[in-house]
A protein has these predicted regions:
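Short S/T/G/P-rich N-terminal loop/turn motif that feeds into the first structured element of a domain
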Residues: 1-91
């Protein structure tokens, strides 16, 4: 199960941190161990670290209206979203 970091900009840190939408959207996709991070120098720059059992399912879900609505609710600026997937060195 890969660990993934998604970082992006937001409109309001306190609203984003308090929102249940992350869990509501990602939980049914099997995403676990969701942790949030805030840049102390720029609190509108944030990240989410999570374990994702099915990357294809999550990436497919990210293109839905439900994902767009969840991001809009949370104040995410979707054009700033970058997703990084845990990588292992080649053997």
């Amino acid at each position: 199960m890969p660990t993934v970091i998604a970082h992006h900009d937001i409109k309001d840190k306190d609203h984003w941190l308090a929102s249940p939408k992350r869990e509501e959207f990602l939980g049914p996709l099997g995403v676990t161990n969701i942790r949030t991070f805030v840049d102390p120098q720029n609190p509108t720059r944030v990240a989410v670290l999570m374990d994702i059992p099915d990357m294809d399912a999550v990436m497919g879900a990210m293109g839905t209206q439900e994902a767009a609505d969840a991001m809009a609710h949370d104040g995410v600026l979707p054009e700033t979203l970058v997703i990084l997937v845990e990588a292992t060195p080649p053997s």
